[in-house]
């Protein structure tokens, strides 16, 4: 398939929190039941027959779905995680992501436990101090110089994009020294005990914060880190085969959160793809570096006056809106007019920055934190509550309920108060159909054929290839390729055998 210069592969992984009535047993057991129903009853995917990780992803903990995505239970039953298919189009990504939520909701309803079980794409546990990741993946040039130098020009964008990408949060957390940091052997011997950063660092409520832009800003303690269980970072240098091919590899962004608003979700991913490209092309000035990225991250998130000032390495102070405008100008000057998707990103990036500069609170149709703040303020006013009341955390949480019949966000959306990118029909279609222009297409077709062959004793799916028996392996190294021919060839051989 011809590849245009502006093509970029991207995908998102979302960890879900689950609350269940005690009568159903543990949340872990409920999560297992949801996963089993999706694979064994609805047959929406091929369950793993092999362990991908002996501790965190044993055999049968999940698998690849017909829509090209992957659903699994991470960290030995702790939570459901959904990784979208590889996508090139923002609308495909939004639809594929929402389709995963609908699959989970469908399983809950058909099992008959919708009154007892709630699943959330909330990125923080207000009371336990845990966080749930929403990690972004981008195909980038495999260049060590990017990690050594380019990330310094990337951090200012990542730190300040929360002004339009943040989902909002009631309250805040303070990380303390907490329990003693475990030694390496202790972690090896007891890996499951150290899933949560709160087992290494103490987490306490911050009484001085009423509302902030980001759910995860308080929990980020490194700019870049490979051992992410102890070092919540902006970036995880996961140079591996997930999207790797032809001089390109995977960039794994850890600092993100689960947008309910489709517009905010797409703008977050879209602007990030353009900034990555500008960095690869050497267009971002070397002096565009923050003095202290992590301090700026928290200060922007907690600024109740919406000035969002950050300090650059050279001592200049600049607003986050103006800093974002600098990235916008770089990308617009270089890439405007090359395709409809790029122009959509650029025009809406500019529009949202204009709105943030004029009156942020008018942007509730496009920005999650604004919509959530309005809901919380309305509830607080009606009930006569102050900001310390735990009921406000419940409003925050229910904004992220993935069931459209329960979610405060979806109620807002059903009233026509949000800017949508996809239709409900698009989402339903994406529950079974993969993106048509990436390798997810070929992998999806192989999942379908494995499911059609009852009693298949052996298969092994991965992002970059599929083993159909112990003698054959279909390689899928290029994420841009649909891989139609290998699929067709296996179809013929399987019919003949």
Predicted regions and their residues:
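Internal, well-ordered domain-core segments that constitute the primary functional module
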Residues: 109, 115-223
